[in-house]
Amino acid sequence: MNLMRTAMLLAFMTVLFMAVGYVIGGRGGMMIALVIAAGMNFFSYWNSDRMVLRMYRAQEVDEHSAPEYYGIVRDLAKNAGLPMPRVYVIDSPQPNAFATGRNPENAAVAASTGLLHSLSYEEVAGVMAHELAHIQYRDTLTMTLTATLAGAISMLGNFAFFFGGNRENNNPLGFIGVLIAMIVAPLAAMLVQMAISRTREYSADRRGAEICGNPLWLSSALRKIAGAAQVIHNNDAERNPATAHMFIINPLSGERMDNLFSTHPNTENRVAALERMARETSTGSTAPVRPDNAGRKSRSVPRTGWGRGGSEPPKGPWS
């Protein structure tokens, strides 16, 4: 099903890309846009994960440079029956995280330094379990390809303003068509992102809670991340808004309501769903992830440890 959705998504984005090309240069522009879109789809399939990681200047870590963080991901991947993904750290004060990769065998997870500094061990486990759920459901391919193509469509819409405003460029619609392309193309790309992101967050929350073994760990983390995202800006995300739907919580400023134009479901709705899940099941479907006590002698992020940052999270078996 996810493969079919991905194919339909790519087809829609390609048609949208061609439509903007038609506005810029008529039939010739449309054909050029088709060739470019086909090349981008092929390139994005193989390279979009590296492109997104590069956008955020993510640094890969291992069991030596970030033993606690790496150990959490390793244990959760084992719980989920997934191959070990590559593990990255993003230097950003805003607590957040995302997953990327075309399949579970070529996946990566990334957490910000702000997340590792401000969340407890249990909360980080809940967050990373959510990201592994996206990998298990193969959401990461669709999310990453969408981010790449949506960004390209937005740029092409802006490009139309400078080069498509007259009929001498084979533009059959003139300046009015350019204005439509500038407004409609980025908006349509954004709506596609919202459609694929909002429904998948709930399913990833539920599966993530099963992977880590306690829905309340994730619900506590979501509250903290959402609160911090309102006051701590993510400058890289603001420069690359097409990637916003990839994060566990919308990293952009100005997102408050669960409405048509939100890339994520309302946080309180997600928390309520997780709390219902916790009440329905006294124990998770898998054993709670437990820390590697030897690894906990070292810091997960250089010169930092696990901060409690406000209200205490639900206690884990090691607390």
From Swiss-Prot:
Top-level division of the source organism's lineage: Bacteria
Active site: E131
Compartmental location: Cell inner membrane
Cofactor note: Binds 1 zinc ion per subunit.
Keywords: Cell inner membrane, Cell membrane, Hydrolase, Membrane, Metal-binding, Metalloprotease, Protease, Transmembrane, Transmembrane helix, Zinc
GO molecular function, one term: zinc ion binding
Binding-site list for Zn(2+): H130, H134, E201
Cofactor(s) needed: Zn(2+)
EC number: 3.4.24.-
Residue numbers spanned by region Disordered: 277-319
TM region positions: 6-26, 28-48, 145-165, 172-192
UniProt KW Lipid biosynthesis keyword: no
PROSITE patterns tied to this protein: ZINC_PROTEASE
Family per similarity comment: Belongs to the peptidase M48B family.
HAMAP family, sorted: Pept_M48_protease_HtpX
UniProt-listed NCBIfam families: PRK01345.1, PRK03001.1
Protein name as it appears in the record: Protease HtpX homolog
Gene transcribed to yield this protein: htpX
